[in-house]
């Protein structure tokens, strides 16, 4: 059965409305094991015929059968499979991958057939050694002579068996000696049973073949016909496809890293865009989360289980509402379910003096349960009790700021101070509380019994506000409703008070801070987007620069998905490396910012989000260049410089 059979094959190239037919009704039969030379002058159509024979191109019309199968009906992947398993190409200009060693160039066809690394390393090394290149296995093409490069090309053609060797002007770029060595190799391969199809314009080279076919102006003008091979035909066992998704990905990643090393400066600039984007996202979100946590902590320090009742109708102005909340209201609230403590509060600015030191501060008249209601511990001494309230005792508890201002590091407990010229004895010092979210120093205060303060300091019985602590925070809304109902009933149905829920305040502030954090993250994400555009730009440049390499890989059996996968993974490798470095830089930047007393919160989600976005950026922005590479025409790609 014929190995190759062409019948009425034509090939027409179109450029807009202009059509040029370069092959006219080619009829050709080649038997297994033949050494055929196709000879013709430049422009005769011999290279176009070789491209069709090697499944790099398709005929415009006519029939092409390989071992009885209609090749014209094959899709691109089936043609790639046929090239990978059957054909080996030897090109005039060698077509070696510049950034790969001799061994790596030879291994390319085996990569796409799924041959395990150890096995293909051994086979490539053996082939190169048999061709006299055993000491130049790790040399790159620019370190080899023309004859040595052509021998590497022949070794590559034999890597997957090379049942059919297509040699396009294999001696055209060589000196006489190197050309003779290449022809000796081709004759030896023919003797070993390989089918050799030699394309040349030199008659003396063609005469070394067993059969000479002459082509002129796209037509075969001389062909003595097939010459059956004498003797037994060698056994070219069918290849077993050993490819797997994992091995494909690993090989694509190796190729990607090699490509990045070949253009290290450009790769670094591309990485920089991703690094800046990822680092900005992580640092910005850490700052935003830190600011949110700081505000929430400050509000929480005032109590998360608190309800605050203030006098005055909500959303109304111009009314005298200062006397609408009284002590009996607080006593009634204490009897409601889920109320842990309810304390009255009055306050005013006072001058407190000890010896020669005086200090302007806020005096807060409150109840004995204040520390329970506000969960504010005593640092030294004690807080006043119910007996002090009943007896109108002139006792006070100092905040940390006041104690420091009047007594320095000395212990003020038991000492006497003048508050607006009234003598008070210091019972204790409150624990540090810090500033409110609005910047007010909570430690710049003194506490006195409500009865004493209202009578001797403020001269009024109505309250500035009442603080209510609930036992079960989950039921705080129900408790708020009960307080509202109670006070409205006590005030004759008039809503002349306001109730503020600290849990709601925290929730509202958290939502606001979350919005600001998202805004910060969005601004930072724009940097990542710009980095992604940089990845796409560089990958498009890479595809353009490596067009010939893509053609070489297609000629040696790479399918569309292999090329797509290779360039997509290359983009992902760039993005992943940039993501990893960006995470480190982002965390480092956050740590530096934290050293300047800026609140920072480290958490895994922003890191994972930033890295995931970087990875997704590589996937999205790498797809278009990868798709462009995968859709290249092998013949056009090989012809690219």
From Swiss-Prot:
The chain crosses the membrane at residues 267-287, 516-536, 573-593, 604-624. It is a multi-pass membrane protein. PROSITE patterns: ABC_TRANSPORTER_1 (PS00211), ABC_TRANSPORTER_2 (PS50893), MACB (PS51267). Its EC number is 7.6.2.-. Keywords: Antibiotic resistance, ATP-binding, Cell inner membrane, Cell membrane, Membrane, Nucleotide-binding, Translocase, Transmembrane, Transmembrane helix, Transport. It comes from the Bacteria. Homodimer. This is Macrolide export ATP-binding/permease protein MacB.
